[in-house]
Amino acid sequence: MVKTGRDAGLPKPDSDDPTSPVYWGHILEPIVAEQYSQQTGRKVRRVNAVLQHPDPEKHWMLANLDYSVVTDDDVQILECKTAGEFGSRLWKEGVPDYIQCQVQHQLAVTGKQAADVCVLLCGQELKIYRIERNEELIEALYVLE
């Protein structure tokens, strides 16, 4: 919605407001990444760049990664999430669809094969989900985006 301008009438999340979930997600992201490393033994590195799809016909596809997983053949991307009392309901049956699409978009831009999504639910339960590259979904995203 941001890319198309359809978000113009919607309220904007305030990352400086300590009552906002966005604020807490930003504060807790490094802690979630550290806990992921401790639980999996995988090393992660913060990605401080906007990545662009290498195909000139898809140059409009950009991605912001939270972390890259280094020296691991099974997984290359780490997406960190937090969810409070209400947001955690979306995670009852696994990774919500909108997060699945976000991660498939990241895999499309980077050419990577798999990502882990690490979510802190209600500030005390950490869950890790593996998302493998799905070419059919990526092709659908190309059309939709």
Describe each region flagged by the PLM.
Residues 22, 38-65, 69-144:
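Nucleic-acid nuclease catalytic cores
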Residues 1-27:
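Charged, glycine-rich intrinsically disordered N-terminal tails and low-complexity linkers that flank
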Residues 33-35:
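Gly/Pro/Ser/Thr-rich low-complexity, intrinsically disordered segments predominantly at protein N-termini
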